[in-house]
A protein has these predicted regions:
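Short, intrinsically disordered, charge-balanced linker/junction segments flanking boundaries
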Residues: 113-119
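Alpha-helix C-capping/helix-to-loop hinge sites
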Residues: 60-64, 82, 113
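Conserved alpha-helical segments that form or flank metal/cofactor-binding pockets of metalloenzymes
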Residues: 71-108
Length: 119
């Protein structure tokens, strides 16, 4: 699934960030997170208006959707795997899949499993 991009079309922002951008990036990360904001977030932050509009959309999808969190994550994992989006797949496995109780076998099935495999 690995695809390395050495020259992205839109490069993510690197620290130090402008104060407004820093505030947006901190809202996207878990409270007290020590890690650098995700590359996806730093790329969205290149366009501050887009960045400010994406948080409510993401929050709505992840926090207020009609699909149960476990099923949502299975769909996201499978979609990321099929699209070769290894980075995003890994983020969702660690941040959501494991905490929601998906087993290693279920997570592996999102990459290597057939459509009819139970997850």
């Amino acid at each position: 699934m690995s695809q390395t991009v050495t020259n992205p079309r839109i490069a993510p922002l690197e620290p130090p960030y402008e104060p407004e951008i820093d505030a947006i990036l901190k809202k996207w990360m878990p409270p007290g997170a020590e890690a650098e904001p995700l590359r996806l977030f730093r790329t969205l932050a290149v366009h501050d208006e887009l960045a400010s509009r994406m948080r409510p959309i993401g929050s709505g999808i992840l926090g207020h959707g009609r699909v149960e969190a476990r099923e949502r994550e299975i769909v996201i994992h499978r979609t990321c795997a099929r699209a070769g989006a290894e980075y995003e797949w890994g983020v969702h496995v660690l941040a959501f899949g494991k905490p929601l109780g998906l087993s290693d076998e279920q997570i592996a099935a999102t990459v290597h499993g057939a459509a009819e495999d139970p997850v």
